[in-house]
From Swiss-Prot:
This is Superoxide dismutase [Mn]. One of its GO terms (cellular component) is cytoplasm. It comes from Virgibacillus halodenitrificans. Its main location: cytoplasm. Its cofactor is Mn(2+).
């Protein structure tokens, strides 16, 4: 089996003005597509690995031969991160979480606004390229960030919300103003999908 680039669940211009059409197009058809292509290339001749699910593959990198481990980590991580990221956004997104996710956030951070501040700090504070995440870890939620294309599954944590802070994710529109991109992100967060990811992880 070969890994494939998933279709976006909306048009390239659907997240305007938060994320511009050109960024979405390049990010999906070029950046994400390259991770998929390179992942498939790395797995050539490794039939046992090709038959694993993507999450299984990156959850257990020790099972990947050392000579392709870095390629699988970077490109498998990139494929997993972006496949989730697209689903976590919606043209009908924004607002606040409800239900169990809202309860968890309020219990842990005191308020949704305080959670937003801490998540934004993790995203802004990630030096260079990487991601900010809300994850489920042993039944509890926590905020973390990862370098490059590392995914929380590599540390045994389940991501339920993620934000790409690579410059390619925002530079065409926001240039060096990463904090502006981070604050705009809340306008497109798909809290229904976050809730679905949470219920799978909890």
């Amino acid at each position: 089996a070969k890994f494939e680039l998933p279709e976006l669940p909306y048009a390239y211009d659907a997240l305007e003005p938060t994320i511009d059409k050109e960024t979405m197009n390049i990010h999906h058809t070029k950046h994400h597509n390259t991770y998929v292509t390179k992942l498939n290339g790395a797995l050539e001749g490794h039939e046992d690995l090709k038959n694993k699910s993507l999450n299984d593959l990156i959850s257990n990198l020790d099972a990947v031969p050392e000579n392709i481990r870095t390629a699988v980590r970077n490109n498998g991580g990139g494929h997993a991160n972006h496949s989730l990221f697209w689903k976590l956004m919606s043209p009908n997104g924004g607002g606040k979480p409800t239900g169990e996710v809202a309860d968890k956030i309020n219990d842990k951070y005191g308020s949704f606004e305080k959670f937003q501040e801490e998540f934004a700090a993790a995203a802004a504070g990630r030096f260079g390229s990487g991601w900010a995440w809300l994850v489920v870890n042993n039944g509890e939620i926590e905020i973390m960030s990862t370098p490059i294309q590392d995914n929380p599954l590599m540390e045994g944590k389940k991501p339920i919300l993620g934000l790409d802070v690579w410059e390619h994710a925002y530079y065409l529109k926001y240039q060096n103003k990463r904090p502006d991109y981070i604050s705009a992100f809340w306008n497109v967060v798909n809290w229904d999908e976050v809730a679905a990811q949470y219920s799978q992880a909890a």
